[in-house]
Amino acid sequence: MAIILGIDPGSRLTGYGVIEQRGRQLNYLGSGCIKVIGTTKEPLTLAEKLRRIHDSVSELITQFKPNEFAIEQVFMAKNPDSALKLGQARGAAIVAAACAELPVAEYSARQIKQSVVGNGGAEKSQVQHMVMALLNLQRCPQEDAADALAVALCHAHSSQNLIKMAGAARKTVRGRLR
């Protein structure tokens, strides 16, 4: 059994999704968004935003007790400043996982969409639909939470494939599968 915490990092909203994997069965445990937005009068500094992401992810780890952690990789944004902030948000979440001694897996947006929808160029609405279908959800989660659940699902699918390959390798005798 694995409990997987998936993270969709962001400098304003960081999505999280937690699933349980028992063999081929996937169960929804929780999802939501970490809001790192201050007020108009008192905006948060970058350091405060990063601390809030780190502390919130640490709390999620304490609450759900995952044994695996997966996060979306940084994509090259048109605005280099946005890509840097996204990378820093990822770093804050990864440090929280590292402090809890969780293995960290990283997936590109294309890998996640391919794994969940079957099309690496899928639209966000398609990802949300498949997340709902795969986890038997009655309501559509927030966009960032759905993306984080997709990260967790991608990791679950990847680990299932690795287990299959490892099992097949053990069954190989002189180049033949049994």
UniProtKB/Swiss-Prot annotation:
PROSITE patterns per the UniProt record, alphabetical: RUVC
Compartment(s) where it occurs, according to its Swiss-Prot or TrEMBL record: Cytoplasm
Residues that bind Mg(2+) 1: 8, 144
EC number of the protein: 3.1.21.10
Any Pfam family matching the protein: RuvC
Residues annotated as catalytic: 8, 72, 144
CC cofactor: Mg(2+)
The keyword Disulfide bond is annotated on this UniProt entry: no
Binding site for Mg(2+) 2: 72
Reactions accelerated catalytically: Endonucleolytic cleavage at a junction such as a reciprocal single-stranded crossover between two homologous DNA duplexes (Holliday junction)
Stated role: The RuvA-RuvB-RuvC complex processes Holliday junction (HJ) DNA during genetic recombination and DNA repair. Endonuclease that resolves HJ intermediates. Cleaves cruciform DNA by making single-stranded nicks across the HJ at symmetrical positions within the homologous arms, yielding a 5'-phosphate and a 3'-hydroxyl group; requires a central core of homology in the junction. The consensus cleavage sequence is 5'-(A/T)TT(C/G)-3'. Cleavage occurs on the 3'-side of the TT dinucleotide at the point of strand exchange.
Name of the protein described by the UniProt record: Crossover junction endodeoxyribonuclease RuvC
